[in-house]
A protein has these predicted regions:
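Conserved N-terminal catalytic/coupling substructures associated with nucleotide/phosphate chemistry
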Residues: 1-140
């Protein structure tokens, strides 16, 4: 994805996080929402309010990337396999997590179950699905 598109603001398929949260659940809702929709990217190292590229601490960045991959693989049902990559922008390194649209919808957070753990993306927000939307995802 081109840099100007990647950093043009949150949207239906882009989410920004300043850092990787200690609790993966803070971004897992977005992961399943992207898988339930047309896919998307989570960019760690960008302030979601100002769009300032703050970058990531590169000291243990590969461990961080592995932790993201493992968290997504372990927390989601059916399993989601993210593409996690580094990108350098204005001499700062960000982590870009790409989630492809899923073929086995609905995707949900395993620990919450299908009814409580299924999310979709609406514009630049992640929303819990209502009953009828869950049925639509199942029937797709």
């Amino acid at each position: 994805m081109k840099e100007n598109m990647l950093f043009s603001g949150e949207s239906k398929n882009i989410e920004y996080k300043v850092t990787v949260p200690d609790k993966s659940e803070k971004y897992m809702k977005t992961v399943v929402a992207f898988a339930n929709g047309k896919g998307g990217k989570i960019v760690f190292g960008v302030d979601d309010k100002t769009l300032e590229i703050v970058g990531m601490n590169t000291e243990n960045i590969y461990k961080t990337m592995d932790a993201i991959t493992n968290a997504i693989s372990d927390a989601c049902e059916p399993a989601i396999r993210p593409d996690v990559a580094l990108q350098t922008v204005k001499d700062k390194t960000v982590i870009v997590v790409e989630i492809l649209p899923g073929a086995q919808r609905p995707y949900y957070i395993k620990s919450h179950g299908m009814i409580d753990g299924t999310y979709v993306r609406v514009s630049g927000t992640t929303r819990h699905v209502e009953g009828y939307m869950l049925k639509e995802l199942i029937l797709e």
